[in-house]
Amino acid sequence: MTNIRKSHPLIKIINSSLVDLPAPSNISSWWNFGSLLGVCLAIQILTGLFLAMHYTADTATAFNSVTHICRDVNYGWILRYLHANGASMFFICLYLHVGRGLYYGSYTLTETWNIGILLLFAVMATAFMGYVLPWGQMSFWGATVITNLLSAIPYIGTDLVEWIWGGFSVDKATLTRFFAFHFLLPFIIAAMVMVHLLFLHETGSNNPTGIPSDMDAIPFHPYYTIKDALGFLIMIMALLTLVLFSPDLLGDPDNYTPANPLNTPPHIKPEWYFLFAYAILRSIPNKLGGVLALVLSILVLAIIPLLHTSKQRSMTFRPISQCLFWLLVANLLTLTWIGGQPVEHPYIIIGQLASILYFMIILILMPLVSIMENYLLKW
C-alpha cells in the first residue's frame, strides 16, 4: 500500500511543499523569516477576525468600539495589542526577509522576487488601512494626508481622491470601505503567498554561498521544520514580551484622542515601519515629485535583478559590496529616524541627503562596485 502522504491528491501537495521538499543543507537562520511571515499572517488573520466581531466601522462608534474591546470583551485587550504589535513583527520579519534576499542575491529568482514585491505593497496597503480603523487623531489625519497625495496625479488626481474618500473629505464612507478592504486583503495576501511559494519551489531555494546546491539537498522535514519551530518560539516570545510589558511602545499617543477634523495634530506621522518612505516623500519639496519618490523607494526593488553586474550571486565573498549593503541599512535607519522628526533644520537636509544616498547606493554604487570586484578577481 502506498503512503497516503504521497498518494492523496491534497496531502501530497503539502508533502511536496513541507515534508519531502529538497532543501539546501547550508541555509542559515536568515532563511527562517519566510516561515515567520507565514506565522505573522496567521496571527493577524486570527486576531483580526475576533476583533472584527466586536468592531463597528462607523465614525460615531469606531473609537468607542475599540475602547469597548479593550475594556469589556474577554481578553479583548490582548487581541487588540497582539494585532497592533503583530503588524510591527510582520514588518520586522518582512524587512529582514527582503534584506536577506538583497544580501544573498535571491532576487535572481525573478518570479519569486517580483511576486514578493507585490506582496510587500499589499501588506503595506493593508497596514495603512488598518491604522485608520481605530479612528483616533493619527488615524484620521494619516488617512487624510496619505490619500490626499493621490491628488498630485495630473488631470485625474482630485477626482481619484474624492472617489477613494466616497465624498469630499475622509468620513463615514471612507472608514467603511477601509474596513472592508482591510478585512479582504489578508486573504488575497494568503493566496499570493501560495503563488510566491509555487515560484520558489520551481527553482528551489538559494543558499548563503549563492552556488547551486541540488547535489547536496536534505529533506525539509525534520531538519527545517524543527529549525522553523525554534524561530516561531523566539518570535512569539518577543511578540508576547512586547504585548504584555509595553503594548504602546510602538504606537502614537495621539491615537488615544478621538478623531477631530477641526484639530490638526502638531506632527502627523505614520507607524514606524513606514517612516523611511515618509522621510523620502517629505525630502522633495514638490507634491508630485514626493509621491513619485515614495512609490519608487519600494518599486526600485523590481529593477535590482537587472542591475546585478557581479559574476557572483551572493555577497558572502564580496567585502566591498557588503560595506555598501550595511551602509544602505544604516541609511534606512537614518531615514526611519528622520521620518519621525518635525520638518525643520537640520532634519530637512539630513533627510534629503539620506534619500539621495538611498537611490545612489541601489542604482549606481552597487552595480559599479560589483564590476570593480569582478575586475579585482580577474573575472
Swiss-Prot record:
The chain crosses the membrane at residues 33-53, 77-98, 113-133, 178-198, 226-246, 288-308, 320-340, 347-367. It is found in: Mitochondrion inner membrane. GO terms for cellular component: mitochondrial inner membrane; respiratory chain complex III. One of its GO terms (biological process) is mitochondrial electron transport, ubiquinol to cytochrome c. A ubiquinone binds at H201. It is a multi-pass membrane protein. Pfam families: Cytochrom_B_C, Cytochrome_B. PANTHER family: CYTOCHROME B. The cytochrome bc1 complex contains 11 subunits: 3 respiratory subunits (MT-CYB, CYC1 and UQCRFS1), 2 core proteins (UQCRC1 and UQCRC2) and 6 low-molecular weight proteins (UQCRH/QCR6, UQCRB/QCR7, UQCRQ/QCR8, UQCR10/QCR9, UQCR11/QCR10 and a cleavage product of UQCRFS1). This cytochrome bc1 complex then forms a dimer. This is Cytochrome b. It comes from Miniopterus fraterculus (Lesser long-fingered bat).
